Swiss-Prot record:
GO terms for molecular function: haptoglobin binding; heme binding; hemoglobin alpha binding; metal ion binding; organic acid binding; oxygen binding; oxygen carrier activity; peroxidase activity. The keyword Heme applies. The modification N6-acetyllysine is found at K59, K82, K144. InterPro entries: Globin, Globin-like_sf, Globin/Proto, Hemoglobin_b, Hemoglobin_oxygen_transport. This is Hemoglobin subunit beta. GO terms for biological process: hydrogen peroxide catabolic process. Red blood cells. It comes from Varecia variegata (Black-and-white ruffed lemur). GO terms for cellular component: blood microparticle; haptoglobin-hemoglobin complex; hemoglobin complex. Heterotetramer of two alpha chains and two beta chains. It holds the Pfam family Globin. The gene is HBB.
């Protein structure tokens, strides 16, 4: 794994407290609000007309949970992120044509949401460890683009 044992401990101890549904929905919602061009991939999700509409949209929340569930699975396979995310990379690259930069943006938004939810428990060391993880996941998801 690319994390030190200490970094891995920071990630796993915090992740055990994460509400995947709540954090996932908020992270995806914030991505769509902060980076509005990402909305074009979610036109079938209904009302994305305002920040309130996006944050309250049940399809955004459901897909956010799905995204974070996959991310959670990746945390169990940090030594093989490319393999773990190969099918999702293929789907997002070949079928959905998602700009791989969006994976990095979502990772950064996830770090912000975790900091927001956990406050003082989200130490600089924890942030650094999570930043490594979201970068690794983003790179794995972008793998099929190379």
């Amino acid at each position: 794994t690319f994390l030190t044992p200490e970094e891995n401990n920071h990630v796993t101890s915090l992740w055990g407290k994460v509400n995947v549904e709540k954090v996932g929905g908020e992270a995806l919602g914030r991505l769509l609000v902060v980076y509005p061009w990402t909305q074009r991939f979610f036109e079938s999700f209904g009302d994305l007309s305002s920040p309130d509409a996006i944050m309250g949209n049940p399809k955004v929340k459901a897909h956010g949970k799905k995204v974070l569930t996959a991310f959670s699975e990746g945390l169990h396979h940090l030594d093989n992120l490319k393999g773990t995310f190969a099918q999702l990379s293929e789907l997002h690259c070949d079928k959905l044509h998602v700009d791989p930069q969006n994976f990095k943006l979502l990772g950064n938004v996830l770090v912000i949401v975790l900091a927001h939810h956990f406050g003082n428990d989200f130490s600089p060391q924890t942030q650094a460890a999570f930043q490594k993880v979201v970068t690794g996941v983003a790179n794995a998801l972008a793998h099929k683009y190379h």
